[in-house]
Each structure stands twice: as structure tokens, then as C-alpha cells.
Amino acid sequence: MLNEQDSVTEHRSRRKIKFALLGPAFIAAIGYIDPGNFATNIQAGATFGYQLLWVVVWANIMAMLIQLLSAKLGIATGKNLAEHIRDQFPRSVVWMYWIQAEIIAMATDLAEFIGAAIGFKILLGIPLLQGALLTGLITFLILTLQRYGKKPLEFVVGGLLFFVAIAYVIELFYSKPKFIMLGMSMLLPILPNREAVFLSAGVLGATIMPHVIYLHSSLTQDESKTASRSERYSSTKLDVAIAMTIAGFVNLSMMATAAAVFHYGGYTGISNLDEAYLTLSPLLNHTAAIVFGLSLTAAGLSSTVVGTLAGQVVMQGFVRFHIPLLLRRVITMLPSFIVISFGIDSTRILIMSQVLLSFGIALALIPLLVFTGNVKLMNELVNSLWIKLIGWLITIVVIILNIYLLIGIII
């Protein structure tokens, strides 16, 4: 009898540990539903209907594997990806990596910050500059949660992720997509023209986020006193599966809603978020438009927090330089205010930032695969042969797409 009770107690204890370890992937997943995703998915859906849904599906599957490898690196070694690059690569290469990672982090932050500002503009009817100031203030408040430990921040960011997911369940309900066409487009790879390739690269850059690859390895690198490495890795697999499935659903819903409402409603030229909001109201109803504005704001606010955290990890990891998070937030806000002040097309900036991000994916992936495939570093958590093959295949696909994009830009 005592043995049975001990067994039940141990099982409950392990289950508590498993759930206590959930959370880091939800912070990482926020990077996959930022305003850049809104802009790219809406333009892709409005222009090509359901045709590019397969890109979202495969990009999300790739992202799941990549985030799992990043988290696994932190668990197995107690160091994040940037720290491993600093320790094992030549100094000149480390500085090159740091500079490109900072540029990518700033491009990401630009997209996220402007997206949240657009959300406030839509909801409150205020100028974009005031929306940007409000975004900065709320981001500061969310970042102060870090002084109370990781869990409060994980709880808030995870809550915003669920909010955006629920918002898009509502959007799907109102838009009434053609589910047979939707399902077929998720399976059939089609790239009708060069613009589709450009938008696909944007979708890839918006779905697989280089800065989140660096961040996730830092979120799991702390030693746990209550769980073994195998237990932590087991919990991480569940964490990544749940969080990335939610993020994938949101991205699919964004594109499917845009396809159903705009493309098949005859509004194939929708190219910015303000236009999308204004068109949603007469085509569906005012509630759908408000839900869109709320989800954009929530995604923008949460992803700016994640972007700031990632920027700090990149700076500390590569060059051992630390500045207070709030000061970093002020510095990274400046490009957004410049874009807004000069009246540059904010949605175009969002999409271009996502294409820029796609160029940083391979640079993060190559060292990640090298380190997680090293048995001396990873021990029993080293990548299997299949994982190595799939990882390098993903890297090759990303590089080929980037080369195609570069040729297209030059020509």
C-alpha cells in the first residue's frame, strides 16, 4: 500500500515538475506571430488567396525543429548559442556574427514596434507617433516584471499568445473560409510568380525568427535543481509542441482570413494594415475589425518585449557587454520613431524587415546544427542522424531561397 502511495506521489511530483518547466517556448513563439507576420500573411492571402498556405505549414514545421534544437543546446550545455559562437569561433567571425545579429534584432524590433503603434492607431484613432509612445510605455511596464523572476513574464507573454489565437478563431468564424481549398493549399506547393517567391521569403523570415533562435537557448540554459536533463528535455518537447502549434494556427488563420475576405472578395490589392482594418469592417462587421486591431496590438506589444530580451542575449553572449534592458528599449525605439516621423510606408517596412530576417536564418542555423551535432558538447542529447540530415536540408533550402532573392533584387 505504501509503495502504491509512494508511486502516486512520485508520479504527481514529476508531473508538477514537467508543468513547472513549461513556459520558455511560449516566449519564443511570440516571435512567430509578430506584426511582420500580420503584414506578410495578409498581403500573401490577399494577393494569392490560399496558394501560399503550404509555405506557412512547412515553415512552422521547420520552426518547431529549430526551436527544439535551440532549447536543447541550452539544456545540454548550460550556455546559449551566442556564447558557444563566442567561445569556439575566431574573434573576427564573432564580431561579424554580433553585428549581423544586432542588425536583425533591430529590424525585428522595428517591425514589432511599428505594428503595435499601428494597432493603437486603429483602435484609439490616435496618430501613429502617439501610438509609438504608448507602445514604448507599456513595453517598459511589461519588462519590469523580470524583477519578479521568469514566471510572471512567461505568464503575461503566454497570455497574450493565447489572446491572439482566440482572436483569430473569431476572425475565422466571421470570414467563413473555403475549407476544402484551404486544406488542399496546405498540401500542394505552388509558386505562381516572382512576387510569390518574394512573399514566401517574407513568410519564411516571419515564421523562422533568427533572434528567437538565440533567445530560446538562453531561456533553457539555467540549471534546474528539481529536474534532470532528460526530464527538462522531455518537458521542452511538450512546451515547443504546444506553443509552436498555437503560433502555426495563428499564421495559417491570418493568411486564410485574408484570402477568404480580401482575395475572394475582389480586394486583391490590400497592401497595408490600415487598409486591411478599414476594409474588414464593411466586408464582415465592426466587431471583426476591432478584434483584428486588438490582436495586432497584443502581438506587437508582446513581441517587442521578446525582441528586447533577444537583443540583450545577443549582446551579452557575443561581446560580454551589458546595458540595462530599459536603456536598450530606448535605443531600439529610435529607428521606429525615424520611420514614423518621415512618413515612410510602415507596412512596406514590415514586409521588407521580414525578408531581411530570412537572410539571418542560415547564419544562426549553421552553428546551431554544428554544436547540437557535437557529442562532446551534447552527450546523450546529441542530434540523431535523421535530425542532422533534416536540419542541414532546411539550411540548404533557406540559402537557395536567399540566393534567388538576391538575384531578383540585383536584376
UniProtKB/Swiss-Prot annotation:
Pfam families per UniProt: Nramp
Disulphide connectivity of cysteines: none
Name of this protein: Divalent metal cation transporter MntH
Record function comment: H(+)-stimulated, divalent metal cation uptake system.
Protein family per UniProt: Belongs to the NRAMP family.
A GO cellular component entry from the record: plasma membrane
Compartments, record wording: Cell inner membrane
InterPro entries: NRAMP_fam (IPR001046)
Gene name of the record: mntH
Membrane topology annotation: Multi-pass membrane protein
Keywords assigned: Cell inner membrane, Cell membrane, Ion transport, Membrane, Symport, Transmembrane, Transmembrane helix, Transport
Membrane-crossing segments per the record: 19-39, 46-66, 98-118, 122-142, 153-173, 196-216, 242-262, 289-309, 323-343, 349-369, 390-410
Gene Ontology biological-process annotations: iron ion transmembrane transport
HAMAP family, per the entry: NRAMP (MF_00221)
An example molecular function term from Gene Ontology annotations: symporter activity
